[in-house]
């Protein structure tokens, strides 16, 4: 299977997000790459489901709390930027202060 670099990146994000989701379900706190992947994948999937950029920006701030990530991780992630494919094309979604 030949994949473009962008497609490989999305698969890597998806794999890391799946691992993060499983760890959250077990009550474990997420580290930096897990938190980034989890938020990114939720935004990518929401765009795929037909939601708007504004909806994804708001939704991205509701996904994780400080209690769900390791100490100091919330401060390391002031914003998350994700390129997602929406109904009307690919757009950059920026979520400011994603971990509340």
UniProtKB/Swiss-Prot annotation:
Location of the protein in the cell: Cytoplasm
Pathway assigned to this chain's UniProt record: Nitrogen metabolism; urea degradation; CO(2) and NH(3) from urea (urease route): step 1/1
Annotated EC: 3.5.1.5
Principal subcellular localisation of the protein: cytoplasm
UniProt GO cellular component terms: cytoplasm
Cross-referenced Pfam families: Urease_gamma
UniProt family annotation: Belongs to the urease gamma subunit family.
Protein name stated in the entry: Urease subunit gamma
Originating organism: Psychromonas ingrahamii (strain DSM 17664 / CCUG 51855 / 37)
Gene designation per UniProt: ureA
């Amino acid at each position: 299977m030949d994949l473009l670099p962008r497609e490989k990146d999305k698969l890597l994000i998806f794999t890391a997000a799946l691992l993060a989701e499983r760890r959250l379900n077990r009550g474990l706190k997420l580290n930096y790459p897990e938190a980034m992947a989890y938020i990114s994948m939720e935004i990518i999937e929401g765009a795929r489901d037909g939601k708007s950029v504004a909806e994804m920006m708001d939704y991205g701030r509701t996904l994780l709390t400080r209690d769900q990530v390791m100490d100091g991780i919330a401060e390391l992630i002031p914003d998350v930027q994700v390129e997602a494919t929406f109904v009307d094309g690919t757009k950059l979604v920026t979520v400011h202060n994603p971990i509340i």
